C-alpha cells in the first residue's frame, strides 16, 4: 500500500482482496431470490425499482438477468433460483476506475456537483470523503432545496420525508431529522426543478446511488453511482447510456469497510 495524506491506499490486487474479504464483492449477502424478485419488479416497471429511470423498449426478466450477468457478475444460470449470489470483483474494480476517472474530470473542470445518498447507514462517510476531495479540488458542491418535503407510501400510512444535508452530502430525513434509506427519485427531481425555477445552473455531475443517480440520469445530467446486485435499474440505465457509471458492489456493509475503496478512488482521481 502507498500513503495518501493520512489514508492508506491499496493497490489493485490489495483492493480486490479487500472487496472479497469484506463481501463488498464476491459472495455477497443479498440472496439470489431477492435479486430475481427485483429483476422481475423492474421489468414490470414497478416505480420503486426503477429509481427514476424510464427504460426504452421492453425489458423481460431474462433480459435484465443478462445485463446483470454482464455488468454486475451475478450467477448466469437462470435455473439458480435461491441461495448465494455474486458480484464479480473485477467488474467492481473496473467500475471504480471509471467512477474515479469521472471524478477526476469533474475536478479538472471544477464542475458544479451534487453528492447524495439513499444509503446513509453504510455510505454516508464514503460520500463525505468524496465530497471533501471535490471541494479541495475547486468543485462547487451544491446544497439546494433543503427542507423540501414530500410524503412516501408506507405500510402504516404515508411518512413525511425531507431533503437535508450532512455536510455537503444530500440525504432524505424523517420527521425527527434522522437520515433514511430511500429509492425515490423525487428528491433529485425537486432539486433540479428548484434550480431551474430560480434560473440557477444545473449540476454538471451527480454522485450518488438509487434514485439520486437514476433520476439525475433520466434528466440528462451526468450521473455516477454505486449499485447493489438487487439494483438492476442503474445497470439498465448504464446499458442505455443514461447513467454514466454504475459500480457493482454491496452498498450496505459496515461503513469502515468502504474506507479502502474511498482511498483507492481518491488516489486514482488525483484528489487525495
Named regions from a protein language model:
Residues 2-112, 117, 122-129:
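Electropositive, gly/pro-rich neighborhoods at or near active sites that engage anionic ligands
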Residues 128-187:
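Long, charge-dense
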Residues 123-129, 154, 214-219, 234-237:
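A short acidic (Asp/Glu
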Residues 111, 139-140, 221:
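Short phosphate-binding/catalytic loops that engage adenosine nucleotides
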Residues 201, 216-272:
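C-terminal functional extensions of proteins
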Residues 144, 209, 224-228:
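Generic beta-sheet signal
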Residues 177-193, 213-214, 224-226:
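Catalytic alpha/beta core domains of metabolic enzymes, predominantly
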Residues 188-217:
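Internal active-site segments that recognize and position negatively charged phosphoryl groups
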